[in-house]
């Protein structure tokens, strides 16, 4: 590791700790030349599959785009940022678990719909209306009826 102060390569770790529920390692380092101390954070870099769009174009997975779309559906809904981040982490895990280098955008959309259905039914309907391009009120009603007909989805808020 290069020292950010004098750019030498000779640094040593003087302390290490797990952070972020064990998903990162925080290391305290000291330069052997200038003796300055600095902190580094290490995390595993996981390769995400690319997304096959409806027009067959390939696009790199974009976590910010996923987060933005889910936030828009969850706008003004009583869902914590932690719950959203957990859902995003689960969706990314599902994508990696496919083992495929490329996944269709429809699969990603289904994972998002499943996650939103668990988080907040209103957000689920909002997302579904855009994702499935609802044309009229009838389609909203049909989707709401599906939610009401599935007793495993009923939760007390």
Swiss-Prot record:
Cofactor binding summary note: Binds 1 zinc ion.
Cofactor: Zn(2+)
Coiled-coil segments on the chain, per record: none
GO MF entries: ATP binding; DNA binding; zinc ion binding
BP-aspect Gene Ontology terms: negative regulation of DNA-templated transcription
InterPro entries the record matches: ATP-cone_dom, NrdR-like_N, RNR_NrdR-like
Stretches assigned to the ATP-cone domain: 49-139
Pfam family of the protein (one): Zn_ribbon_NrdR
Zinc finger (unnamed): 3-34
Keyword set, alphabetical order: ATP-binding, DNA-binding, Metal-binding, Nucleotide-binding, Repressor, Transcription, Transcription regulation, Zinc, Zinc-finger
Function comment: Negatively regulates transcription of bacterial ribonucleotide reductase nrd genes and operons by binding to NrdR-boxes.
The family this protein is said to belong to: Belongs to the NrdR family.
Stated name of the protein: Transcriptional repressor NrdR
């Amino acid at each position: 590791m290069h020292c950010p102060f004098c750019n030498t390569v000779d640094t040593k770790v003087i302390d290490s700790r797990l952070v972020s529920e064990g998903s990162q390692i925080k290391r305290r380092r000291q330069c052997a030349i200038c003796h300055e101390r600095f902190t580094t954070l290490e995390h595993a870099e996981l390769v995400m599959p690319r997304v096959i769009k409806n027009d067959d174009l390939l696009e790199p997975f974009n976590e910010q785009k996923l987060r933005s779309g889910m936030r828009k559906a969850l706008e003004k809904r009583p869902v914590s940022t932690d719950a959203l981040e957990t859902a995003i982490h689960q969706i990314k895990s599902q994508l990696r678990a496919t083992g495929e280098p490329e996944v269709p955008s429809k699969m990603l959309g289904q994972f998002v719909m499943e996650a939103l259905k668990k988080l907040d039914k209103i957000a689920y309907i909002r997302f579904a209306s855009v994702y499935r391009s609802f044309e009229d009120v009838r389609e909203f009603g049909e989707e709401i009826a599906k939610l009401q007909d599935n007793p495993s989805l009923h939760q007390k808020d």
